[in-house]
Structures are given as structure tokens and as C-alpha cells.
């Protein structure tokens, strides 16, 4: 076991605080409408330019191990805020730094760290309750646009795109962010249910100019197994040919003789058929086939429930208004499924989302909900260079998470005003069990001004003057750093999601409280490289002797 380096008391806290300040100072320059960029060097490729707090925090590793421990703990604050609300990482870092700095001053003055921590926890709990009282629902398209704009660092086009996307696919819908091909940002909405499986043979194509298969009013045959024998398919094919409608086969796979016969029939015009693989794998494939069945009022032909493909009839087939297939995707538009059954299925999947503990599973289940409920929106981010594209995608991603958080828990006045108002409201009535807890309460409430002060500092103004003016105001009165004007923050469109502000404060206080109560730090002693080199050199000499 390696030898350890141990530091106690003030020595440990000074080192830890230095690490906290290095990381927080790097992150906080990005805060607010006039926040600056940070350039991150990469081991290969061009450097990344970002205004995303958590991206900056993740890059920072310090050489001194004690300082690095402090930095890593603040990094945890940014990561947790990002995981919980998808935004507010810089605010969380600024709050953590302010609470740790104030707290360690009090500890150095001889206060009891545990009582300070209890005071901080009381203040945070009271302010979180007050934030919920200040919160108002985020319902209109305009409010959603404003939240998106603020989170994308005052990029109004991003705010508009997110608002339009939510209008098209609903607030629960899936909105994804992809690289665009031009310079402009675009919104692409996929109506109906789309899954990432294309046609099994290019000979099915009936629209050569777009290289797609288009089927109008088709039947859909859903099969939970591989089809390789054409005899199994003949009864269904004959029924569909008599009905004079096209057929889409969705199965685990269609291969060999079965696929060849379908292609020949299609080319001769005997029956219009296309085949695609079923989406997903394993249990997820079964579930997605069932989703398609409910959407199109069909039945999944599965041997697990005693159904055989040879005995399938037209009643077992689903129907839709239109199906479009290209080499990568299949889109089913306007399935004839019963509305009540579709809603029941959506409710069932939502229940699974509630119970799931895996983020990946939740994401996949959310996608299924969106596909059943009516569509997926894709925001295509345009930029002149790849470096700009990465930076912009980060901002769009943040804005998307922030708007979701706003829809979930509502909005409060932005620009750090909500924390100042909530802190002022609880300051008069909140009391600790002893004087040291009261000091903890006061230092936490004072630290809650830090985001407002940092936004103002980044805008090149005097933080104390603005903070004093905002504190003397009432309600949503605050300072718009973008236009350098005072006024009603909500009317000016400067909004923050309540969830983002709440999460930032809770995570910052949690980690800051642990750091204030730290009395000892332990790390590995660095290895003595010189000794290792000496030993290696001696070995070399011995080798030379052998050669003599």
C-alpha cells in the first residue's frame, strides 16, 4: 500500500479552498448574457470553445492533489445540477464557491463547523420553499421561447425553434439536437411514428426520384419472428391482392426465398409489397411491435401466444393512411388505431418511466411515448465551422433541458433576482438554535447574492451598486445585464426555470456544507521518480558488466 500524505485543520482547508477557487473562477466567467468563452485544449483535433459551465468544470484537473480534491468536489456540484435539470451548472458553481468562502472564514474565526452547516441547511430549506411560492407556471409559447433564449445565452433563434418544436410535438414530445448541413438552424418535425429501419431490398422502391417506397392506405403485417419460407406468407398475400391494397411486412427479418418472391411479385406488379426489419432488439422489439399494432389496430403474429403466420387473416393486419420508407427509416402516418387504446398504452409506458432507474431506459421509453403521441422534432444546428457547431450544440442542449425544467416546475425572475428576493423574505423570520447557526443562516443568505453579482461583473458593471439597487426594489424588479437596464425581469423576458435555480442551490449547499466540516485530507504521496531512475540506471550498468 502506498504511503499517504495527510493534512489537518487550517492547512487542509486552505489547500482545498484554493482548488475550489481555481475551478469556480474558470467556470464563472461564462455566466450571464455577457459571459465570456473558455477555450479547452483537446489531445487531438481543434480546441473546443464553450460557454457551458459543466464542460469547463469537467476539463479541470489540478497538479496539487489537495487542491484537486477541492476542485473535484465543486465539479460534482456542476455535474449534479446538470444531471438534475440540464442547466444551472455555472450558477451552482458560483453559489458553492460563495458558501465555501464565507463558511471557511467563519471556521477560521473559531465557529463550530457543524452548527454552521446546520444553519446553512436551514437557510437553503427555507429559500427553496420560498422559491416554490414565487414560481409561476410556464405555459405560453412566448414564455417557453424566453426561457430557451436565456439558457442559450440570449440566442433568440434557438428560443424560437424550441418553442415551435414543443408546439408541434407537445411538451412531453421528443426533441433531439443534430448537426445541420447549412449555416442556419432548422426545425424538422417527423409526423407519425418513425423508427430506424429501412427497406430490406432496393427493388421495393416505387419513387426512384427520392429513392423511397411510398404506400397509400396499406395493410401492415406484424410478425415477431424471421420469415424465410414463402408458403407461410401466401394466405396473407392472396387476401391483400384481392383487396387491391399494398402491404408492409414488419418482421424480425425477411430473407431467402420469401424476400426473393416478394421482390419478384412487386416488380411484376402482382401485389405491391415492402418489407422492413422490426425496430429494437429482444424485449424492446416485442414492445415496439405491440406499439405499432395498437397504433394501426393490428395484431402481432407471435408464436408465444399461439398464433401462426399461415393462419393470419386480413382482420389481423393493421392499417394506416400512408407509409414512407427510405434506406434508413420507416414512417407510419395516421394509423387507424383506437384513440382510447393509444392513450392507455401511453399511460402504461409513462408508468414504466416512473419506475425505471436507468437513464437509458427512460430515454427509450420517452421516445416510444412521443412516437405514439404524434411525432419527434429534430433541431438541426447550423454553423460555419465544426468548433462553432460543438459550442452551439452545447447551448441548444442546455436550452432544451431548461425549457423542459420550466414546463415541469414553473419559472421565476431570472438574473439572480429570485434568489435575492427569496433570501430577503426568509431573513427576518429565520432563526437557528444558537448564535453559530444564525451565522450559518446569514452567510448562506449572503452567498445567494453571488449569481447576481457575477452576472453584473461579467457585464463590466459595478456589482455592489447593482446588488444594492436590486435589493431595494420589490417583486420581479431586477437588472437586465444584456441591455443594462433596470425593470421587471419577467416582463423583459429574463426568466429562469424554478427547477434549475432550486437544484443549483441545493447541490451547491450540500457539497459546500461537507467542505466546511472537513478537518482532515488524505492523499497518496507522489512517487519518487529519481529513485526509480537510479535503480533503472544501476540495472543497466549490471548488464554492461555481463557483456565485459
Swiss-Prot record:
* EC number from the UniProt entry: 5.6.1.7
Q: GO molecular-function annotation terms?
A: ATP binding; ATP-dependent protein folding chaperone; isomerase activity; unfolded protein binding
Q: For ATP, which residues are the binding ones? A: 30-33, 51, 87-91, 415, 496
Q: Which GO terms describe its biological process?
A: protein refolding
Q: Which reaction does it catalyse?
A: ATP + H2O + a folded polypeptide = ADP + phosphate + an unfolded polypeptide
Write out the entry's keywords from A to Z: ATP-binding, Chaperone, Cytoplasm, Isomerase, Nucleotide-binding
Q: Does the keyword field hold Nucleotide-binding?
A: yes
> Which InterPro entries does its entry note?
Chaperonin_Cpn60_CS, Cpn60/GroEL, Cpn60/GroEL/TCP-1, GroEL-like_apical_dom_sf, GROEL-like_equatorial_sf, TCP-1-like_intermed_sf
- Name the PROSITE patterns on file: CHAPERONINS_CPN60
Primary subcellular site in the record, as a coarse category: cytoplasm
Location comes to: Cytoplasm
GO annotation, cellular component aspect? cytoplasm
Q: Which residues form the signal peptide?
A: none
Question: So what does this one do?
Answer: Together with its co-chaperonin GroES, plays an essential role in assisting protein folding. The GroEL-GroES system forms a nano-cage that allows encapsulation of the non-native substrate proteins and provides a physical environment optimized to promote and accelerate protein folding.
Return the similarity comment: Belongs to the chaperonin (HSP60) family.
**Quaternary structure per UniProt?**
Forms a cylinder of 14 subunits composed of two heptameric rings stacked back-to-back. Interacts with the co-chaperonin GroES.
- Any idea what this protein is called? Chaperonin GroEL
Which organism was this protein described from? Haemophilus influenzae (strain PittEE)
Source species taxonomy: Bacteria, Pseudomonadati, Pseudomonadota, Gammaproteobacteria, Pasteurellales
Gene designation per UniProt: groEL
Amino acid at each position: 500500500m502506498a504511503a499517504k500524505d495527510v493534512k489537518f485543520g487550517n492547512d487542509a482547508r486552505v489547500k482545498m479552498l484554493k482548488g475550489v477557487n481555481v475551478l469556480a473562477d474558470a467556470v464563472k466567467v461564462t455566466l450571464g448574457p455577457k459571459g465570456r468563452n473558455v477555450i479547452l485544449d483537446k489531445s487531438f483535433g481543434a480546441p473546443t470553445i464553450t460557454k457551458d459551465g459543466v464542460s469547463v468544470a469537467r476539463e479541470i484537473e489540478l497538479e496539487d492533489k489537495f487542491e484537486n480534491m477541492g476542485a473535484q468536489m465543486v465539479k460534482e456540484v456542476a455535474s449534479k445540477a446538470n444531471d438534475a435539470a440540464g442547466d444551472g451548472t455555472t450558477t451552482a458553481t458560483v453559489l458553492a464557491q460563495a458558501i465555501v468562502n464565507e463558511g471557511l472564514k467563519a471556521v477560521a474565526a473559531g465557529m463550530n463547523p457543524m452548527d454552521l452547516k446546520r444553519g446553512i441547511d436551514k437557510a437553503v430549506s427555507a429559500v427553496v420553499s420560498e422559491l416554490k411560492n414565487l414560481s409561476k407556471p410556464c405555459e405560453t409559447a412566448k414564455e417557453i421561447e424566453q426561457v430557451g433564449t436565456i439558457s442559450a445565452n440570449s440566442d433568440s433563434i434557438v428560443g424560437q425553434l424550441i418553442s415551435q418544436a414543443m408546439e408541434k410535438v407537445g411538451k412531453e414530445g421528443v426533441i433531439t439536437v443534430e448537426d445541420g448541413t447549412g449555416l442556419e438552424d432548422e426545425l424538422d418535425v417527423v409526423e407519425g411514428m418513425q423508427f430506424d429501419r429501412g427497406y430490406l431490398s432496393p427493388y421495393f422502391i416505387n419513387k426512384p426520384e427520392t429513392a423511397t417506397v411510398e404506400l397509400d392506405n396499406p395493410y401492415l403485417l406484424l410478425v415477431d419472428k424471421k420469415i424465410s419460407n414463402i408458403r407461410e406468407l401466401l394466405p396473407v398475400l392472396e387476401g391483400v391482392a384481392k383487396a387491391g391494397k399494398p402491404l408492409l411486412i414488419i418482421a424480425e427479418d425477411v430473407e431467402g426465398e420469401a424476400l426473393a418472391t416478394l421482390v419478384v411479385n412487386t416488380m411484376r406488379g402482382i401485389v405491391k409489397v415492402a418489407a422492413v426489419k422490426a425496430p429494437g432488439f429482444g424485449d424492446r422489439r416485442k414492445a415496439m411491435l405491440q406499439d405499432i399494432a395498437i397504433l394501426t389496430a393490428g395484431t402481432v403474429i407471435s408464436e408465444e401466444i399461439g398464433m401462426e403466420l399461415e393462419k393470419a387473416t386480413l382482420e389481423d393486419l393493421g392499417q394506416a393512411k400512408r407509409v414512407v420508407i427510405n434506406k434508413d427509416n420507416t414512417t407510419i402516418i395516421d394509423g387507424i388505431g383506437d384513440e382510447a387504446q393509444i392513450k392507455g398504452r401511453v399511460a402504461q409506458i409513462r408508468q414504466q418511466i416512473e419506475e425505471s432507474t436507468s437513464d437509458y431506459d427512460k430515454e427509450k421509453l420517452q421516445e416510444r411515448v412521443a412516437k405514439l403521441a404524434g411525432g419527434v422534432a429534430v433541431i438541426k444546428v447550423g454553423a460555419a465551422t465544426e468548433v462553432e457547431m460543438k459550442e452551439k450544440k452545447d447551448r441548444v442542449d442546455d436550452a432544451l433541458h431548461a425549457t423542459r425544467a420550466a414546463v415541469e416546475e414553473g419559472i421565476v425572475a431570472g438574473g439572480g433576482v429570485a434568489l435575492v428576493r427569496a433570501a430577503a423574505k426568509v431573513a427576518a423570520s429565520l432563526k437557528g438554535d444558537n448564535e453559530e447557526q444564525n451565522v450559518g443562516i446569514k452567510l448562506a443568505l449572503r452567498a445567494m447574492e453571488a449569481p447576481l453579482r457575477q452576472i453584473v461583473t461579467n457585464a463590466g458593471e459595478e456589482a455592489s451598486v447593482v446588488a444594492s439597487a436590486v435589493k431595494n426594489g420589490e417583486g420581479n424588479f431586477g437588472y437586465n445585464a444584456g441591455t443594462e437596464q433596470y425593470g421587471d425581469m419577467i416582463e423583459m423576458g429574463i426568466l429562469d426555470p424554478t427547477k434549475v435555480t432550486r437544484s443549483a442551490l441545493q447541490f451547491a449547499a450540500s457539497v459546500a456544507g461537507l467542505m466546511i466540516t472537513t478537518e482532515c485530507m488524505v492523499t497518496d504521496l507522489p512517487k519518487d521518480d529519481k529513485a526509480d531512475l537510479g535503480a533503472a540506471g544501476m540495472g543497466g550498468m549490471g548488464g554492461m558488466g555481463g557483456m565485459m
